[in-house]
């Protein structure tokens, strides 16, 4: 069902769109915390884990409400599958943000230049997705532009990821360095997976925009 048939100028946001906005904002808040930690802005690893976990819990609650409302609502402003999948991918982004820090803590891995770039770019992608969801009702074409920017940023993350992996293999010349490489590669993969989810969220937004304009 097209969004233009449900929304009118000046009307309050539909509850599903508002829940998606709230969820995207929580994800952005979490990635803001992560990016600041990578820039060494006086946040301890333990404190970051607690704060990221709190954001994750808040976002999960929003998603639970959204799914419950989907079950109890006959007519939705967007296709049910699109609402569900967009919420899922946004949720996964924050989950991977948390598990990135958790894995770094468990594997005793410090941040490096590649991780700093990847996380900063992911934070920007999350910001574009949050803007896309906010513009979806009144300005779907603008929402599509933000979704395309998010996809471009995801491509940048994957390029940094490939460069980082290549550099790791070049440095691994003995057993200890090999173990370090394997641990660090695991962290890179967490951020790469986060980027994949951002790309999937952007794809869903693109499909929504095509249906409503």
Regions found by a protein language model. Name each.
Residues 1-213:
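Cytosolic, long alpha-helical scaffolding segments
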């Amino acid at each position: 069902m097209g969004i233009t048939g449900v929304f009118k100028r000046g009307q309050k946001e539909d509850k599903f769109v508002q829940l998606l906005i709230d969820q995207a904002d929580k994800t952005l808040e979490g990635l803001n915390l992560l990016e600041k930690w990578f820039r060494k802005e006086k946040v301890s690893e333990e404190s970051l884990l607690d704060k990221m976990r709190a954001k994750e819990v808040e976002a999960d609650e929003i998603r639970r409400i959204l799914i419950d409302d989907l079950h109890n609502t006959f007519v939705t402003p967007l296709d049910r599958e699109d609402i569900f999948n967009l919420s899922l991918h946004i949720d996964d982004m924050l989950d991977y943000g948390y598990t990135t820090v958790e894995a770094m803590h468990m594997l005793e891995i410090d941040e490096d230049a590649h991780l700093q770039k990847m996380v900063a770019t992911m934070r920007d992608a999350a910001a574009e997705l949050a803007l896309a969801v906010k513009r979806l009702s009144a300005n779907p074409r603008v929402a599509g532009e933000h979704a395309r920017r998010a996809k471009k940023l995801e491509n940048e993350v994957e390029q940094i990821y490939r460069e980082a992996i290549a550099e790791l293999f070049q440095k691994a010349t003995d057993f200890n360095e090999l173990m370090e490489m394997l641990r660090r590669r695991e962290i890179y993969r967490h951020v790469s997976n986060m980027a994949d989810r951002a790309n999937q969220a952007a794809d869903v937004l693109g499909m929504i925009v095509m249906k409503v304009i």
